[in-house]
């Protein structure tokens, strides 16, 4: 399954606010979009778990294959699989750039990374899924075009609050990863346990 590139409003109307996908916010209705959406019926356990999984996939801009790989990796690590899964996704370079305010959304952040505008420890890294770790320094490439894009993005950051595991110096356009993100700083409202259950069926 490929990465979603369609209208974001339809997705957030169905799944609720997805801060990584878009800044747009719509009131979530009691029924899904579409002409048959108002028909009420009891949702199955599968449907509930699927919705939580879809929240994660669309918010972080992952393909189904990428998400499956993250779940498998989380299961192999010690600790709560659900929380480790969220940490793996939050520590991706495209998400770190987004959380630092260098891009308004994760898709915009991914584009910055893909186009070689972002450096990690003074080396250009063009892989959005690159796993950042404590001690990593995130900077903008020493190029006027790169700096201009990020300076403009900083005027309208996607999320107002900088997570406790990150620090950012606007004057230098430099961020630092100080720690692994804690669960309370994950901006997406999601039940990660249901996602683990979905892939354990």
From Swiss-Prot:
It is found in: Plastid, Cyanelle. Its main location: plastid. It comes from the Eukaryota. It holds the Pfam family S4. Residues 91-153 form the S4 RNA-binding domain. GO terms for cellular component: cyanelle; small ribosomal subunit. GO terms for molecular function: rRNA binding; structural constituent of ribosome. GO terms for biological process: ribosomal small subunit biogenesis; translation. Keywords: Cyanelle, Plastid, Ribonucleoprotein, Ribosomal protein, RNA-binding, rRNA-binding. Coiled coil: none annotated. Belongs to the universal ribosomal protein uS4 family. Part of the 30S ribosomal subunit. Contacts protein S5. The interaction surface between S4 and S5 is involved in control of translational fidelity. One of the primary rRNA binding proteins, it binds directly to 16S rRNA where it nucleates assembly of the body of the 30S subunit. This is Small ribosomal subunit protein uS4c. It comes from Cyanophora paradoxa.
């Amino acid at each position: 399954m490929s990465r979603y590139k369609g209208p974001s409003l339809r997705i957030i109307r169905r799944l609720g606010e997805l801060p990584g996908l878009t800044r747009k916010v719509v009131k979530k209705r009691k029924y899904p979009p579409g002409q048959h959406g108002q028909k009420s019926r009891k949702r199955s356990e599968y449907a509930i778990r699927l919705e939580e999984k879809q929240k994660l996939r669309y918010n972080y801009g992952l393909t189904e294959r990428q998400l499956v790989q993250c779940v498998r990796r989380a299961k192999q690590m010690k600790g709560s699989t659900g929380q480790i899964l969220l940490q793996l996704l939050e520590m991706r370079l495209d998400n770190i750039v987004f959380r630092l305010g260098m891009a308004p959304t994760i898709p915009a952040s991914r584009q910055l990374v893909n186009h070689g505008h972002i450096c990690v420890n003074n080396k250009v890294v063009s892989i959005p899924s690159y796993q950042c770790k404590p001690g990593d320094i995130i900077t903008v490439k020493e190029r006027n075009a790169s700096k201009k894009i990020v300076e403009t993005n900083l005027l309208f950051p996607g999320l107002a609050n900088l997570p406790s595991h990150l620090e950012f110096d606007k004057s230098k356009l430099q961020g630092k990863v100080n720690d692994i993100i804690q669960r309370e700083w994950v901006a997406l409202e999601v039940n990660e346990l249901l996602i683990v259950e979905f892939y354990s069926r």
